[in-house]
Regions:
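Dinucleotide-binding Rossmann-like beta1-alpha1 core, especially the glycine-rich loop
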Residues: 1-24
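Helix-loop-beta segment of a Rossmann-like dinucleotide-binding subdomain
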Residues: 22-60, 83-85, 92, 99-100, ...
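A conserved short coil-to-beta-strand element within the FAD-binding core of flavoproteins
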Residues: 66-82
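Flavin (primarily FAD) cofactor-binding/catalytic cores of flavoenzymes
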Residues: 68, 88, 202-206
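Short, hydrophobic/aromatic-rich segments at coil-to-beta transitions
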Residues: 80-85, 150-151
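Short acidic, glycine-rich loop/turn motifs
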Residues: 86-94, 144, 157-158
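Active-site substrate-recognition segment that forms the wall
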Residues: 99, 103, 107-121, 126-226
Length: 226
């Protein structure tokens, strides 16, 4: 963290001894730590960021089409990618496909990138060397009345020592994230599992004193694959 401060040219890092930290954060369990460090990080509204990028792209001449899946790549006999077969996955037209030719095809498919890479390489599932390991991250949202916070916390899970975050967001409190290998990707909607809910609740209740957050306190959840 001190190295980050040095690179940024600003000083955000600060260390608190146990008594000093507890005076500012009395709801933290006293038997769980010896001290704490303060640092600065970035935050963004990912939904608004996506919409802003789409708006800017459309303004510059792009066409943004929802519910359109890159089903497969169109290649020449020499293996050159010259387009893609697109599938309309909207409920009204779930069987329609369209072949679109292009001078350049850019794959910005995230965790699904290996699927198109395998097609472009014309290899099989058995011979293709995958470079992407899909991982699922899930979060819980509870009310600020049940877990009032005025700043974000990062700490280690008591079971597997993974980093967990708890932070205030839009008059709510967010608990997250998990990090699990995701099964082979398909069109199934990604969602949090019961085991992940228990995992996040265990971590939160271990850090905060007399909170006892349970499933009935969960307002909503979300999950994503990276």
């Amino acid at each position: 963290l001190r190295v980050y401060d040095k690179l940024a040219g600003k000083h955000y890092f600060k260390y608190f001894k146990k008594d000093a930290f507890l005076s500012l954060n009395p709801h933290i369990r006293q038997d769980k730590f010896l001290g704490a460090s303060q640092f600065s990080d970035a935050v963004t509204d990912d939904s608004r960021l996506v919409m802003r990028v789409l708006d800017e792209a459309i303004h510059d001449g792009a066409h943004a089409i929802n519910y359109l899946k890159a089903e497969s790549l169109i290649t020449t006999e020499q293996g050159l990618v010259v387009g893609a077969t697109l599938k309309d996955t909207s409920p009204q037209h779930s069987t329609h496909t369209y072949d679109v030719q292009a001078k350049v095809v850019v794959s910005a498919t995230g965790a699904w990138a290996d699927t198109l890479r395998m097609q472009a390489s014309q290899q099989t599932e058995q011979t293709f060397h995958k470079q992407i390991r899909p991982s699922r991250g899930s979060h819980l949202v509870v009310s600020q009345e049940r877990l009032p916070l005025n700043q974000a916390y990062t700490f280690l899970h008591p079971v597997d020592k993974r980093a967990i975050f708890v932070f205030p967001w839009e008059n709510r409190t967010v608990l997250g994230t998990t990090d699990l290998d995701h099964p082979p990707l398909d069109d199934t909607e990604v969602g949090i599992t019961n085991a992940e809910v228990d995992y996040l609740l265990t971590a939160t209740n271990d850090l905060f004193d007399d909170v006892d957050i349970s499933r009935k306190d969960v307002i909503s959840s979300w999950a994503g694959v990276r």
